Amino acid sequence: MSEILSSVDQRTKLVGENRLELLLFRLGTRHTYAINVFKVKEVITVPKMNMMPGIHGNLRGVTIYRGLTIPVIDLRQAIRMRPVNADNTTIDRNVIITEYNRSVQGFMIGDVVSIVNTSWEDIQPPPKSIGKTNFLTAITQIDIQGKRELVEIIDVEKVLAEIIEYDVTISAEILDQAV
């Protein structure tokens, strides 16, 4: 229990020091992507998955994770890259288990590179010239194995918003308060 508290304390200090942790990974290419570790629960090898009829095209299936049935999203396909081929044994595939808005899901990826700490000052918005339909929240440069690489930070919330239908309702009581 003390290890968990220590880990939480370390992550809390990062926020206070204007720093963040990024999980760096690849999507079957040499290019490096990242997501904020704050939302990551665990990284696992690709588990057995079941296909369900009528699921979204970016879902590879559902699996059982710690007693929960969760969707597994093909991140390559979700950000409009070629999907990871489920039969391709040359790609070491993993699943990043995340929690967003009290919803747990997995993102199928290629290889995990590492976890790095970086300063918010080193994070930049993506270039405006790439358009509004991209799935990037930011970009940064990170030293990976002695080489400075451009890392694209994926906007996981945007990916999820395209897959998961959110039921947004406003009660009459709240509407009355606004008037």
Where in this protein do the model-derived segments appear?
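An acidic, low-aromatic, low-complexity terminal/linker signal
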Residues: M1-V179
